[in-house]
Amino acid sequence: MTQLFYDTDADLSLLNKKTIAIIGYGSQGHAHALNLKDSGMDVIVGLYKGSKSEGKAVSDGLKVFSVSEACEKADWIMILLPDEFQKDVYLKEIEPNLKEGKILSFAHGFNIRFGLIKPPSFVDVVMIAPKGPGHTVRWEYQNGQGVPALFAVEQDSSGNARSLAMAYAKGIGGTRAGILETNFKEETETDLFGEQAVLCGGLSELVKSGFETLVEAGYQPELAYFECLHEVKLIVDLMVKGGLSQMRDSISNTAEYGDYVSGKRLINSDTKKEMQKILKDIQDGTFAKNFVEECDKNKPLMTKLREENSKHEIEKVGKGLRSMFSWLK
């Protein structure tokens, strides 16, 4: 059984007298910065000139500097920028300000795992990755709770990188819920696979195909939307709360029987083989190479696909139906 670590396992005092620079002030950035600040840490924010987030960070009581200035002042640098921007910002603004004894950290291992960022040997390189969106990380912390997190050490120059990573996880509230140790390779590959095969790619295509099947068979698009998209959350909430078994305990016998006899007709050995191919593309760097090349070209394919998907009938139907639900407004 994988070991989880909690508040008593981490020493927050290891962060005392360290200036922590949060690079980026988006969903995760604001949560990390404010949680660390409320934990008594010295936190500054690094943003590019003219960033729309500067005013928000200042109003939240944080000192804002350019990325270069923040990294020069900091003992600990947490990069919370989108994956595709990290390499360029690192080379221009962060790397020139790295000195022996500094800690370089990430919330996702993409750029380290695929060699886009290659830190010098004289810094610690760690990861602290909350398993929830930034607003949840902040909300749970403010309510005396926390969001579970992963932590990992890629490079231990100081000999104390593991304890430092655990201390940071405690500072953002992770050890209140429990933190799990991993490595950059495992975190990156499982995260990308989950997004592509199940959570985003797999689920999106499943929902669209179900919707299309019903509409093409002559059923009302609104009913198809309810059955194939709207009710996904109801089932997923049951799964998250108690696993597949509790979900099946909560649905009708008709639905449960249909689950068992029809599910494997759809998700079968052929589907699993495609999943294995997706995983292989992630493991051997094919996906990362393609994504980097796409970003270098200013995302033409991604922009095209985004536009095409936004015009799908399910989007038009959903826009009208969502106005019915007061809790979504």
Swiss-Prot record:
Mg(2+) 1 binds at D191, E195. GO terms for molecular function: ketol-acid reductoisomerase activity; magnesium ion binding; NADP binding. Residues 2-182 form the KARI N-terminal Rossmann domain. This is Ketol-acid reductoisomerase (NADP(+)). Its EC number is 1.1.1.86. The gene is ilvC. Residues 183-328 form the KARI C-terminal knotted domain. Belongs to the ketol-acid reductoisomerase family. One of its GO terms (cellular component) is cytosol. Involved in the biosynthesis of branched-chain amino acids (BCAA). Catalyzes an alkyl-migration followed by a ketol-acid reduction of (S)-2-acetolactate (S2AL) to yield (R)-2,3-dihydroxy-isovalerate. In the isomerase reaction, S2AL is rearranged via a Mg-dependent methyl migration to produce 3-hydroxy-3-methyl-2-ketobutyrate (HMKB). In the reductase reaction, this 2-ketoacid undergoes a metal-dependent reduction by NADPH to yield (R)-2,3-dihydroxy-isovalerate. NADP(+) binds at Y25, G26, S27, Q28, S51, S53, D83, E84, F85, Q86, G134. Binds 2 magnesium ions per subunit. The active site is at H108. It holds the Pfam family KARI_N. It catalyses: (2R)-2,3-dihydroxy-3-methylbutanoate + NADP(+) = (2S)-2-acetolactate + NADPH + H(+); (2R,3R)-2,3-dihydroxy-3-methylpentanoate + NADP(+) = (S)-2-ethyl-2-hydroxy-3-oxobutanoate + NADPH + H(+).
